[in-house]
Regions:
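PEST-like low-complexity, intrinsically disordered acidic/proline/serine-rich tracts
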Residues: 17, 27-287
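Bacterial N-terminal signal peptides that target proteins for export
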Residues: 1-14
Length: 287
């Protein structure tokens, strides 16, 4: 029988059908991986790393801290069914205890979307954990430290001190702040202060000030899923603390890769402002 050549218009449909047919096998493989026990380090810590001899990174979840009023409160399936991001972990806009100026700024940012991340600036909180290049969490019990590496974009990393130290009293405000951590059962709890007000803690620009006290809770739900929750306690921008979160998925056989933000950024209008109509160097990175 001669080979059948499909018309170009049908080829994308054929590829889609083939991909859908492959989903059950992939889902079955994912179920097998989820059945693997949560790995631990020699000192008893839950491991967020790839098992010895294997590769893998944590893939980003939904990096919004707040969802619109009209969005359905359902669990969205990510990565062809390999994990879910429960939207009920995220508050609706009306439930966030904004101060008036912070609400106004948040709404302004939804229209203009001038995110510092698009200009190669560092991020914090949920946004630092949710990047398109994969996230590495490296645990060094010998040093009593945990590192969270963001190899793409701004090439930044965080150090979480696990040795019981207190926050310094004379911190200079920075994008990442100063982080100390401890374990509550199998949940890593990270306490961070010392932020400046220029970094965004999510992709939609929930405002923060230098009064921000961020508490993050990271739990490996099973082999394939990582629960991330953060509580924002910032009396400069909100009238009460509030919590949001996401679920991240393990991507096996993958590694973080280098992306040079300044050299690789093809959206020059985000770097200097003005779009295709010209360069507006007065456009603020953070209003």
């Amino acid at each position: 029988m001669s080979n059948v050549v499909l018309p170009p218009a049908l080829r994308p449909l054929t590829l889609l059908i083939a991909a859908l047919c492959a989903l059950p096998a992939w889902a079955a493989e994912s179920d097998v991986a989820s059945a693997r026990p949560v790995p631990r380090l020699a000192n008893g810590w839950v491991s967020f790393e790839a098992p010895p001899g294997e590769k893998g990174v944590w893939n980003r979840g939904d990096y919004r801290a707040v969802i619109p009023e009209t969005e359905q409160q359902t669990a969205l399936r990510d990565n062809f069914g390999r994990g879910s991001d429960p939207l009920n972990q995220k508050p609706r806009f009306s439930a966030v205890p904004f101060q008036p100026w912070a609400r106004e700024l948040f709404l302004w940012r939804q229209v203009h979307e001038i995110e510092p991340y698009g200009r190669c600036k560092p991020t914090g909180g949920l946004r630092h954990m949710s990047v398109p290049y994969g996230t590495d969490i490296v645990q060094v019990p010998e040093q009593q430290r945990i590192y969270i590496f963001h190899t793409g974009g701004s090439h930044s990393f965080r150090t979480i001190y696990m040795d019981g130290r207190e926050h310094p009293s004379d911190l200079d405000p920075s994008y990442g702040g100063h982080s100390v951590g401890h374990w509550e059962g199998d949940t890593l709890v990270i306490d961070t202060v010392g932020f400046n007000e220029r970094g965004w803690i999510d992709a939609r620009g929930a405002p923060t000030t230098q009064q921000l006290h961020l508490t993050e809770r990271i739990t490996r739900l099973d082999f394939n899923r990582l629960s991330y929750d953060m509580t924002i306690d910032d009396p400069g921008a909100y009238t009460a603390p509030w919590t949001t979160g996401m679920v991240m998925n393990w991507t096996p056989e993958s590694e973080t890769f280098q992306f040079l933000c300044q050299d690789g950024n093809l959206a020059q209008e985000l770097m200097v402002g003005g779009g295709s109509t010209g360069v507006d160097r007065t456009s603020p990175i953070v209003p």
